[in-house]
From Swiss-Prot:
Gene3D superfamilies: 2.30.30.30, Nucleic acid-binding proteins (2.40.50.140). SUPFAM superfamilies: Nucleic acid-binding proteins, Translation proteins SH3-like domain. Belongs to the elongation factor P family. It is found in: Cytoplasm. Its main location: cytoplasm. This is Elongation factor P. The lineage of its organism: Bacteria, Bacillati, Bacillota, Bacilli, Lactobacillales. GO terms for cellular component: cytoplasm.
Amino acid sequence: MIAASDLKAGMTFEQDGKLIKVMEASHHKPGKGNTVMRMKLKDVRTGSTTDTTMRPDEKVKKAHIDTKPVQYLYSQDDMAIFMDLETYEQYEVPTALIEEELKYLLENMEVKIQFYGEEVIGLTLPTTVILRVAETQPSIKGATVTGSGKPATMETGLVVNVPDFVEADELLEINTAEGTYLKRAK
């Protein structure tokens, strides 16, 4: 059991037979009354999200999540296929379960797959990935004053705001947690 005050973003717990992932968590002290935990929670199995509050001393059962290193092979018919790097066993994961993560995946990329018992519940991406710019607006000379950047579509379909000097076919390092441009890849 774990206290609600100890829950952090990314942790998973069990509640009423559901597997719940904490997306955001913060302490909130209203003008009157006791401190509460404000949280954005996601049901791992259904994908539905809810905003809720809990007392800091409320207890929840922490879920035991195992991870295995796998290699992303390909996607086909609403399934993403991964191969275990140790046993070469293949796992089929519904693309609806990993919809956001798919925007960062290239074939043969190594990631970690998350298990709850025998059930696949998600992926852990590396903190950064290197993706090629598939399409972006051409650079305009002298347009460096604004600094607002421009949208660029990456080879996986991910759209990232990039600086004006970035052009198509360049390799960029992307932060997977926030989906933001970090730098040009070497």
